[in-house]
């Protein structure tokens, strides 16, 4: 029986490239002259630090633009609240990876509500979808792509 997996992953190499490009842009921008501002990537978290809250917002927009250029979906960003320590502001931006159980249940419910002839099962941090026909699986992929679930999904391990 044909099957595929629904996963939510971030390409860490592209994430690192986007952070490096964002740091390069900070060094050339006029409005960030003589300002201590930087992006730092630690595992799946980008630590943003600047001298003002307004600059943090600008830096998030810079990062979002570079993520889009590198093909990383910005919907996977989860920006924590900004904290002020002394004259500097810090913010952690966590990139979500994997499908949490509540989101996996939403996906399974979405597939069942679409009345497609496929079965969906939750397997850890991914959802496996199996069906008799390849066309049913492709309809399932289309249904999930059109649904606004607030997280980017990839479809891999497609088997006939």
Curated annotation (Swiss-Prot):
Stored Gene3D superfamilies: 3.30.70.860, YajQ-like, domain 2 (3.30.70.990)
| Record keywords | Nucleotide-binding
**Any Pfam family:** DUF520
Q: Please give the organism.
A: Vibrio vulnificus (strain YJ016)
Biological function: Nucleotide-binding protein.
Protein name listed in UniProt? Nucleotide-binding protein VV1636
Q: Name a GO molecular-function annotation.
A: nucleotide binding
Matches recorded under PANTHER family: UPF0234 PROTEIN YAJQ (PTHR30476:SF0)
Has UniProt tagged this entry with the keyword Nucleotide-binding? yes
Q: Name the protein family.
A: Belongs to the YajQ family.
Does the record bear Nucleotide-binding in its keywords? yes
GO cellular component term, pick one: cytosol
């Amino acid at each position: 029986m044909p099957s595929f997996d629904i996963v939510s992953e971030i390409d860490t190499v592209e994430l690192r490239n986007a952070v490096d490009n964002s740091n390069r842009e900070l060094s050339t921008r006029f409005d960030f002259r003589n300002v201590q501002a930087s992006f730092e990537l630690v595992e799946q978290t980008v630590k943003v630090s600047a001298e003002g809250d307004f600059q943090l917002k600008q830096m998030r927009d810079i990062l979002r633009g570079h993520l889009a250029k590198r093909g990383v979906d910005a919907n996977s960003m989860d920006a924590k609240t900004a904290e002020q320590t002394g004259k500097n502001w810090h913010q952690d931006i966590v990139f979500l990876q994997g499908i949490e159980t509540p989101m996996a249940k939403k996906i399974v419910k979405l597939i069942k509500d679409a009345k497609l002839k496929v079965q969906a099962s939750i397997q850890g941090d991914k959802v496996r979808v199996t069906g008799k026909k390849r066309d049913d699986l492709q309809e399932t992929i289309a249904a999930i792509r059109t649904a606004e679930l607030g997280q980017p999904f990839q479809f891999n391990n497609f088997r006939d």
